[in-house]
Amino acid sequence: MNWEEAIVRVLSEERGPLHYVEITQRIISKGYYEPRGVTPENSVGMYLRRNPNLFERVSKGVYKLIE
């Protein structure tokens, strides 16, 4: 599983918006993806911002899955 797949899975399970730090914590705690870098939150935030066709920003740092 890659970052994008892990983000989609977490947001699908939640069925609502989450802050990108919370998304990252859930990905790591559930073992969906093993981060390689020092700042996995930044990686998740980048994926969310760069994929507006998949993720909608609802407030600062908070995103939901576009269905």
Question: What are the residue ranges of the model-derived segments?
Answer:
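Charged low-complexity interaction tracts in eukaryotic proteins
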Residues: 1-9, 14, 18-21, 27-67
